[in-house]
Amino acid sequence: MKVLEKKLPVTVLSGFLGAGKTTLLNHILNNRENLKVAVIVNDMSEVNIDANLVEHGGSNLSQTEEKLVEMSNGCICCTLREDLLMQVRELATEDKFDYLLIESTGISEPLPVASTFDFRDEDGNSLSDVAQLDTMVTVVDSANLIRNYSSTDFLKDKGESLGEDDERTLVDLLVDQIEFANVIL
């Protein structure tokens, strides 16, 4: 794969479930000022509810000039990571978008998503050849942050986990999401 002269800038939105990522994404899309934007929405469930909210949330994505990619039934930080690599590479090499927004699922850790951009495959190709990770945004539910931060609950006890072996606590995930962000909303 060749290195593109103009790399596709990418913003990744993370934050726990219900923090407002999809609301923020819709706000950004409604105020994009003629930029051609591609969007990847990741949801753990089989039915990508967040993608549906974006598609029908008044963002008016142009079907001919813009693209909404749904990545469902897994997490882009682990089980769908290879799919993320392929989708970002495809969108970047199409060379028709000004920006890429990625909304990760609420239980996703930002570090593995970001490291996807530095990963080099066996042929020496990397997403960093065609795309530039511009901003890592974490959306925080400020009304519940203190309560969640002092919680000892495991994600799986809340019905939210990456699988049976997921031993993360809610506070571990919140710390990962907040510490890795360069923008917190």
Regions of interest found by a model, annotated:
Residues 2-167, 171-172:
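Nucleotide-state-sensitive switch-loop elements of NTP-binding domains
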Residues 35, 180-181:
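Structured helix-beta-strand junction loops
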Residues 135, 182-183:
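Well-ordered beta-strand positions
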Residues 172-180:
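Membrane-proximal helix-turn-helix segments that form the acceptor-binding/catalytic region
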